Amino acid sequence: MNQMWGSIEQYNTVVWHWPIAVYLFLAGLSAGAIISAIIIKWMKGNESSPWDGIIKAGALIAPLTIGAGLLLLIFDLTRPLHFWKLLIFYNFSSVMTLGVLALFAYFPVVLIFLLGVFKKELCDEGPFGFLAPLANIAYSMARPLEIVTFVLAIGVGAYTGFLLSAMYSYPLLNTPILPLLFLASGISAGISGNLLIGLLFFGKSTKGENVGYLHGLDFKVILFEAFLLFILFVGMYYQGGSTAEVAKAALTTGGLASLFWLGVAGMGLALPVVLNVALPHGIKHSSGFVMLNALIVLAGVMALRFYILYAGQTFVG
């Protein structure tokens, strides 16, 4: 197999380019943000207003990132003005159709969650008083709405992996581990996004115990991601034949191998773990370090999306 250097746009086997990688990142970030926000909301002491800053952060991040991701996806289509057809003509054997249906249900419920959390700012004192009935639903039916939102968010997070795993002729993508890996990394990104935005913009209402809980949860999720990546490549190697060659090439060939070892394994997985193990308790639980760690994790998750998308399409056996 020839070594490949330079821009990753040069590889003629690549049909999905960087906008898809960014979309996959934003969709996972949205799902992870709302999942971790709901987890915090369900904890004792966080069930009612005034809301913790992490809940506020998740309520903002979830609809904004999925909205931005969908716009990016639409404009990346060869014929973006025909996107509406996906909403009318369903093919239930298509992963794309099932994903669109999940997103079609997910987007409204995260908007209602946002209205419930920011009811005072948006409806009572803001310009969106006409949306107060929806905000009231978020209050009166909080737990059922949150359960539905939580389940849909898991579906959206996993769907980003299913979308790629349906590409049967690409060994690195066509694996059942990918949906779980993308869900886990999306949750990690969502936790980091909530910690970053919560501490930056809602610091006064962000409880230290909630920050500590999510920071510790993210550490566990990162270890789980590393385990999934290990299983992914070991499994491919022991399948033998061209699949083993693809696994070897993806880890050793050109700029994509560098992206994996430096961006995914190094920055995204090893660095947060080492910092959290090596640094004194006072430093690693400070707001400054938590925000820095969140930025590192977000960059690592973005690197993972780019790596899987491009390496999966480049190394095909």
Curated annotation (Swiss-Prot):
Q: Check the record and name the InterPro entries matching this protein.
A: Electron_transfer_protein, NrfD-like
Topology versus the membrane, per the UniProt entry? Multi-pass membrane protein
UniProt KW Signal keyword? no
Chain segments annotated as transmembrane:
20-40, 54-75, 98-118, 147-167, 182-202, 221-237, 259-279, 289-309
* Localization in the cell: Cell inner membrane
Q: Please classify the protein's predominant subcellular localization into one broad category.
A: membrane
Q: State the GO CC annotations.
A: plasma membrane
By its UniProt entry, which Gene3D superfamilies does this protein fall under?
A: Formate dehydrogenase/DMSO reductase domain
Q: Which UniProt keywords apply?
A: Cell inner membrane, Cell membrane, Membrane, Transmembrane, Transmembrane helix
Q: Function of this protein?
A: Could possibly serve as the membrane anchor of the enzyme.
PANTHER family, alphabetized: PROTEIN NRFD
Q: Can you tell me which family this protein belongs to?
A: Belongs to the NrfD family.
The subunit structure is: Functional polysulfide reductase is made up of three different (A, B, and C) subunits.
- The protein's name is Polysulfide reductase chain C
